[in-house]
Amino acid sequence: IYVPDDYQTSKKRYPVLIINDGQNAFFDEQSYIGKSWGFLQAVKQLNIDVILVAIYCNFELLKREDEYGPWIMNQDLSREYGTHRLVGGEGNAYVTFLTTQLKPYLDQNFPTKIDDYGIVGSSMGALISFYAFLKYPTIFKKCAILSTAFWIYEEEFVNLLKVSSISHNMLYMDVGGQEDDKRYIPSNEHLKECIEGKLQNYQYHFFPNGKH
């Protein structure tokens, strides 16, 4: 958990950003991709007052896919991961933990703005971030999703989006032209079209040379 230097004396309350795949958030030596996202440098350079909560994923074999998968993958998709079991399905329990255990703990122990939470993630971490954003729009009012693996649960997200009340919330979304699976671009474009009719405070960026 990162807190502003003066949080104990300033008497301010701060917005909170939940960071999935949290081992990538701060330090290169902790990142499983070898390079951190540089959140510490960013908040200091931009002079942003925010509490950052970086949550490590379970990086055992297929556990990240289970933990960040809101629904159970179908058999064909599960087999792409080289297993005969069905993958995913623990994401709802994870998001329930965020909303019913982690958020109350943060609000009780840190000077949070209790109605100003955001959530961010990439790839599978983006899937679970977007799921939380749609499932609990009164809690997670801001969301950033990068290189989202929408093709895994494309139909499920389209259906959830139809019944989610996110019209007053904020969303950032991007995808690269050099992702490691050709399904990233069309599935992100499809969800982009569905999202555009749901909220106005929304940015979508396509980076032609962007890699996963």
Regions found by a protein language model. Name each.
Residues Y2-H212:
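Non-catalytic cap/lid and distal C-terminal segments of serine-dependent acyl enzymes
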